[in-house]
Amino acid sequence: MLAADLQNRIMNYIRAHSGFETKRTYVGMSHLSECPADQFTTFRDGLPETDYNHRMAYLGYALETVEKAILVNAGVLRSVGREIVAEFDNRIRGHIDGETVDGDLVEIKTVSTVRFERILESGKALRDHFTQVQAYMHFGGYRHAEIIYVCRDDFRHHVVHVAYQPGLGEQIEAKARRVLAAIDEGRQPPCECRRSDASK
């Protein structure tokens, strides 16, 4: 078999089994840290179907599966996977990785060495991950979360504890409501990050 043919077969398989979704019928809680204008555009137009996105999705799901097996066999998790749906609108959804035996939310994040070192140095979760678990806790009724960071390059682990902040949870819900209102009106909401197309 020619090397080029072999490489094409591998990539074709990854594309077919990556689990990458170009478009969803809901707004993911994991993206509520993003600019409302970007969330609106993603909901309306979807995400580009690139080989990079397929590769990253496949790798992410593969590492997550391995990590969940470790956590279950280590006696850390009592359950794996759960869909959280906002009571006020089922278009706000999230999928958690699991719950500890104590009932805390668990979120697994695989990151590069650079980001892993940044987390170790600060002792804190990355901003978008922090907001993500705050959203899960707000809509899912959790009081505590454990973010398990896994370095993709050397498989180091680091756990960051995050406590629920009701005030922030309310802000996240208000933002989610604004995004849905914009979707219903078919009008892009104001940019809050100064990087999206809406700000130009």
Which role fits each region the language model picked out?
Residues 2-4, 123-124, 135, 139-200:
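Metal-dependent nuclease catalytic regions and adjoining charged, substrate-binding loops involved
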Residues 108-109, 148:
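Beta-strand residues in well-ordered beta-sheet regions across diverse protein folds
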Residues 1-105, 111-123, 127:
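Metal-dependent nuclease catalytic cores that hydrolyze phosphodiester bonds in DNA/RNA
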